[in-house]
Amino acid sequence: YYTPKSIVTLIVEMLQPYNGRVYDPAMGSGGFFVSSDRFIEAHADEKHYNAAEQKRNISVYGQESNPTTWRLAAMNMVIRGIDFNFGKQNADTFLNDQHPDLRADFVMANPPFNMKEWWNAKLEDDVRWQYGTPPQGNANFAWMQHMIHHLAPKGSMALLLANGSMSSNTNSEGEIRRAIIEADLVECMVALPGQLFTNTQIPACIWLLTKDKSGGNGKAHRKGEVLFIDARQIGFMKDRVLRDFSTDDIIKITDTFHGWQADKD
């Protein structure tokens, strides 16, 4: 289940993980961690720091259910010299959370879209379902709530989901979405163009959530506000079937987001 590299880069650039705990509960082979590592290297000159020293301020936590992919992710980190904690073993994120006490500064994931086979009766009154029990036939809001649960008090997160997550009212999804919005957790929504994925035609969006919109530290007070970015016309056709974002496209979207975060007229 592959996330396009440009979308991984976009999410990392939007979240800006310069230091703190980075967590991906559906990590695959660890693409978000590699991208976070590269992010620190890419911004070293502009921010006047030593990349190797700066990387010591990041700690990486991940989980993956597939044993081969889990080992591949570990290998990926070792090759790049990234310290990591991927739990004791590969495991189902919902049934066997490898980091139950983790509260991360940055949580990022591209879980499988509209995952049907995820429910187990043991999950009925789970502490993670703070905004409502997710429907048994779709894990979208289970992933989102799992990530919210693992956010530090001032943490931010980004989640790539199918567009249906913005409007679906199946079972409890509408109520959960309403509760999350009313809790003022949603910071920004990015609508993405179609044809970004090799394995699905489902159009996708990025949900960016944060526990703290009160501003300070160069950020504006944004309580009660949500930024909507329509990126559906952005990008270029890489070949006949696949669309992609250029570096300039990524900069355009991230500058829009960071400008809104900082600017208050």
Give the ranges of each region predicted by the language model.
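Conserved S-adenosyl-L-methionine
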Residues: 3-109, 114-118, 125-130, 141, ...
